[in-house]
Amino acid sequence: MIFTIGNKIYVNQTFKKSFQKANINYSKFSAQPTILNNVLWYAVAETDKNYTMAFYSIFDNNTRPTNFINIPKNHTLVDVNHPDIRTLRWFSNEFYTLSSLNNNQVIYKDLRYPLLDQKDSTSSLFSFKLIKEGKRWNTKSLSEERF
C-alpha cells in the first residue's frame, strides 16, 4: 500500500511533466494503476476537444510517457444535460467520449480505465450503447454483445 501511494505521487508528477513537454494543455487529468498492478500506470487528460491518454511503467527506460492516444470527445452528439446522460457522466467522473451509431443510438465510452487494446481507441473497458426510446436514453453494455 505504501508503494502504491509513493508511486501515485511520482507518476502524477511524471504525467504532468510529460503533458507539459508535449504541449498538451489539459483542464484536468486522472492517473491510476492498471488493473491489479502498481507498475504500469494509465492517465487520461481532458483538453478542449479531445481526451489524451498515455501509459507509463515505473520500470520504463524513458523518464516519461512519449506515446499519446487522442480521442475526440464528441459531446455534441447528445444532450449531455439529459438526466440519463448526467448519471453516466457522474459514473465516469466526466471522462467519457461518444460515437454515433445512427439517429437513435450512440456509444458511450468511459475513459477512466485503460483501453483493452492500446492500439484500438474504441476498446474501452466500460462501453455502453445508448438507445433513444421516447424521452429516455436506455443503456446496454457492449460487453454483452462482444461475447
Go through the PLM ranges and name each one.
Residues 25-28, 35-147:
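Extracytosolic and intramembrane catalytic regions of membrane-associated proteins
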Residues 1-11:
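Internal/C-terminal transmembrane anchor helices
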Residues 15-17:
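GHKL/Bergerat-fold ATPase module in large chromosome/replication-associated machines
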